[in-house]
Design a protein with these regions (language model features):
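Intrinsically disordered, low-complexity polyampholyte segments enriched for Lys and acidic residues
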Residues: 10-13, 28
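Tandem repeat scaffolds
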Residues: 46-190
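Bacterial N-terminal signal peptides that target proteins for export
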Residues: 21-34
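Short terminal hydrophobic/aromatic SLiMs and anchors at protein ends
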Residues: 1-2, 9, 22-25
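N-terminal signal peptide c-region/cleavage motif recognized by signal peptidases
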Residues: 42-44
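Hydrophobic residues within membrane-embedded alpha helices
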Residues: 7-11, 38
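Ala/Thr-enriched low-complexity intrinsically disordered regions
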Residues: 3-4, 13, 17
Length: 190
């Protein structure tokens, strides 16, 4: 996250932890080459990454590792290409998010509502999704290597091409909504 102060800075949005953020003004001439370079190289848009967590927020190519969004409402948010490694989303409302190509490795998303979420090609390596609701979620080509999905609801989820190696599905409600995976369901529902 950007945090700066001094001449040429304007008070920005409140960050995920409730801290005020200061973002350099584009009027500050020495900053223009830096901003243009980041835009041309596809770097993060600072204003968007500093936006407060809220329904429909757009965070693209942001670095939000270790952030705590527990209990927050991010319904319908655009989180594409963003890194949330080791972030906390316990009991967060994430229904309808687009987290395609995002990184949630080691994130704690236990009891989160991910109904209808798009998580195509998303890295969920060792993520904790215990008791999470993933009804109708699109997890095509997602990496769920050693993810904890114990007790999760996967009714209607799409897992085509997903890496499920070592994922724990014990007690999870499987794709058809009828089958409950048995204890020790590692890598597949048994």
């Amino acid at each position: 996250m950007l945090a700066a102060s001094g001449p040429g800075c304007k008070r920005g949005a409140v960050g995920p932890a409730g801290r005020s953020l200061y973002i350099h003004s584009v009027i500050n001439l020495p900053r223009i080459p830096l901003l243009l370079g980041l835009l041309l190289l596809g770097g993060p848009a600072f204003g968007a990454c500093a936006d407060s967590p809220a329904p429909g927020v757009v965070w693209r190519r942001c670095l939000l590792d270790n952030a705590d969004f527990s209990g927050r409402d991010l319904t319908g948010a655009i989180l594409r290409d963003t890194s949330f490694a080791r972030a906390r989303f316990v009991e967060a409302k994430l229904a309808g998010i687009d987290g395609s190509d995002a990184r949630f490795s080691f994130a704690d998303m236990s009891r989160a509502d991910l109904t209808g979420a798009t998580l195509r090609s998303t890295d969920l390596t060792r993520a904790v999704l215990a008791a999470a609701t993933l009804k109708g979620a699109d997890l095509r080509r997602a990496t769920l290597f050693r993810a904890d999905l114990r007790g999760a609801d996967l009714t209607g989820a799409e897992l085509t091409g997903a890496n499920l190696s070592g994922a724990d599905f014990s007690g999870a409600r499987w794709l058809d909504g009828e089958k409950i995976c048995g204890a020790g369901s590692i890598g597949s529902c048994q």
